[in-house]
Amino acid sequence: MAAPIRLTVPGTLRYRPVAVRVVAEAARLVSSSARVDPKDPLVLDVRDPFDTAVVSAFMEIYNNVAIHAYQRREGGMIELAITPTDRELVIELRDNGRPFDLEGVEPLDLELDHGDDSLPEGGMGIHIAKTMLDEMTYHPGPPNLWRLCKRLASQPVAGRS
């Protein structure tokens, strides 16, 4: 396994773009979709489905840590270990915020009620992340540990059907 990229940021929404930038670039290392706009090489391009899934799931979990574990208070930190390989991306987030019971998150009822245009409350971010990832685990702490894993889709082998 490759050496992880390590980053520690304050556990607030203000620092989310910093963490997202690093995660997006790590995803691009795995997907090999590093498209650079010659006019602005710093523009974040996450059009590749792998990159989009990783960034979307990561943002949901980061939001949960900042909003729920740290209760929107300053002072907490989020430690990231991001490990890109040629087949997958593994992201570990550690925080010392308030733990919670992941197993207690009820599955969402996504049946449409055409008379109600509101989104379900509670668990939406967890549902989104689980849907986007191949694996997601959570171990309450301290420290709390999230482990997110996204694998590249299998590529067909030449000469096989």
Predicted regions and their residues:
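Short C-terminal beta-strand
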Residues: N144-A153
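A conserved short beta-strand within the histidine kinase catalytic ATPase domain
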Residues: G75-T83
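Glycine-rich/acidic phosphate-handling loop/turn and adjacent ATP-lid/helix
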Residues: I91-E121
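Short, highly conserved beta-strand within the GHKL-type HATPase_c fold
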Residues: A81, R87-E92, R147
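Conserved glycine-/histidine-rich ATP-lid loop and adjacent helix of the Bergerat-fold HATPase_c
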Residues: I128-N144
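Glycine-rich phosphate-binding loop
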Residues: D116-L133
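A short, flexible helix-to-loop-to-beta junction within the catalytic ATP-binding CA
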Residues: A69-E74, P140
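Conserved short strand/loop->alpha-helix "switch" segment adjacent to the catalytic nucleotide/phosphoryl-transfer site
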Residues: R21, A27-M59, N63, S118-P120
